[in-house]
Amino acid sequence: MKRIFSIIITYTLLIFLMGGVGLITSSCTPEDQPGQQPGTEEPGGEEETPTVPGAPAAFSKFISTISKGENLDIPLQGEWNLLYKGFKAGDKITITMVNDASVTFTLTCTKADDETGAFFTIPTKFIGGNCKVVAEAGGRTTTGTCFVNIVDNFEVEKKSGYTTYGRVVDYDGNPVSGVTVSDGALVTKTDANGCYYLRSEKKNLFVFISTPKNYKVSIDRAVPQFFHRFKSTKSSIYELHNFVLAPEENTKHRLLVWSDTHLANRTDDKNQFKKYFKPDIEAEITKAKSEGVKLYAIGLGDLAWDEYWYKNDYSLKNYRADISDFDLTIYSSPGNHDNDPTIADDFLAAAGFRENLNPLYYSFNIGDIHYIMMDNTLFSNTGGNNVQDYKEGFTDDQMKWLKGDLANVQKGSTIIFGLHIPWTNRSQANGTFTYAMPATQRSEVESLLSDFKVHFISGHTHTNYTNVMNSKMMEHNIAGVCGTWWWTGYYSKNKCRLNGDGTPAGYKIFDINASDVKWQYKVMARDASYQFRAYDLRNSLITRDLYCPAKDNSKVSDAFFSEYANGYDKAANTTSTKKVLINVFDYDQDWKVEVTENGTKLSVNRIDGKDPLHTIHFNMGRMNSNSTSMTFPTGGTAHMFEVSTSQTTSSVVIKVTDRFGRVYEETMTRPRKLYDMSKEDKW
């Protein structure tokens, strides 16, 4: 009888050590998984060193954990064993979601002693997140904000040679089958019991899931937790990694896409980001909640600026902190400036991105849309001394992963394919364009995508354009949040932020219902109806005395000034003309631009031109500081339109209709001055 009792006690303690689950191993059948080559079974790997609970720590350490906001790991099932002294039965810990006070749980201590610690009840139907934590214990109340991580400690049965394994379940412990799981090279799917197995070499440092339709993962300071970092880089060591999901109806959803924030603690960038970008995003969050629409976001790279990671002590860690208060799920992809400038190796230089954000490439599903996030910067940084040279392309592992991922996507689906460097170059006025991606990989990827409808989304250029490649594929190259690296805001005293093509700084909003996708460019700090800007060219003369008047600009020759005035210093192009110039920020081939003068419809010509306002607020601003460093001068764009009027002072009605039938209209009264926005705020 004593022996039987001893066995029962031992078995009970083992259950507690495993996180309080009712079964020790799963009923998963460790067969070769779909999407992964079975091959010859490898010899068994090394056992992962088990974590053995030590003696309970002092109560003061628990107080420190809460007050410092450190992570709290709470088991999915059973009881929560807190290995601290000083608790007593009846003590309470209340956790409340920071951004949703209606989600709150009071966890009660059921028993406690200084030998085994305290045992608390656990929350139900909860996957964790950023929470306010209030602990009423030890005769005191302690408050902090922590990421609460719901951990599934369920022991999935091992299979020899498959050293990365685990399961995917919902917050009730029910298995979720058919979920794509990968280590960044191999791809598999969960079986009927929610289990997966990978023969991982662990060289990409993560195991991650492609979050399935109508589910969500927990969010840690705006970053979705769809991944686990390997504990060891030794491929021979077995590692168990389980994932917990919550159901979420998201067939209808909204997506915010931004790129090129380029925060670097210079040119007043942090203030501009805080004053203009963040309130805009907060307004979108509030709007989506009021409409009952699920909202997500994607950041397409160049989120910080590698050159200033060390010079100005602002890196991706700081960027993460600056977005951490958004009540938003933000997926990120790396840009060429998101690499360590002291490291001459593509993979190693991206360590900061992986550490602070997420894997370099991955996929997820929201509603009927399959999202793919890619890393198309092959970073060389020759010599490791801030050279920052790179080329466009994908690693072999990334291509291997992409093939495996797409094999699990239903043909005919809509894919949003995110990357930093664009797939295509901007179009010319006649609508033609060339490709930016190298031909070999471009051809291979487009072949893989040929059975799907694809929207490429990209950044990098600090310009705005949309190219329709064929009936199934198009690209949205999205202007930068920073505009011209925050300089135009700096020069204009925060009255305008412009990209090199004259597009105001902003982001793109996609409204999605099942496979129906609509979009609209949104200018920061302006109403969504602000979609174009019109110039009275007769009053757009740019002169040195008006726009470059500083006495100390001796470096700027008249010839240099004229070169970067972009023709607007010529009277023949300005004061003697009757033309109107219109910059339509998000124009594509299915938009219409119409202009009438006194009821008469005028001929509208699409041209390749340069924006006058950007010419003033970067080119002139730079020269006015006695600098000839034209690092980001005004660039050409083909979303520019020119109209010849019959009179010089007549009003004209400009009507722009986008591809979805939304109409943007302005009655332009002339003469209209070319405003210097550092002095007058008109646009």
What role is predicted for each listed range?
Residues 81-86, 155-177:
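Structural motif
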Residues 17-63, 147-160:
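Bacterial Sec-dependent N-terminal signal peptides
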Residues 35, 52-153:
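Ser/Thr/Pro-rich low-complexity tracts
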Residues 109-113, 185-200:
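Short, acidic Ser/Thr/Gly-rich low-complexity loop/linker segments typical of extracellular
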Residues 155-163, 214-310, 683:
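N-terminal active-site segment of His-dependent metallophosphoesterases
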Residues 155-164, 220-237, 259, 281-287, ...:
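Metal-dependent phosphoesterase/phosphodiesterase active-site architecture
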Residues 97-104, 167, 172, 178-189:
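Short amphipathic beta-strand segments in non-cytosolic proteins
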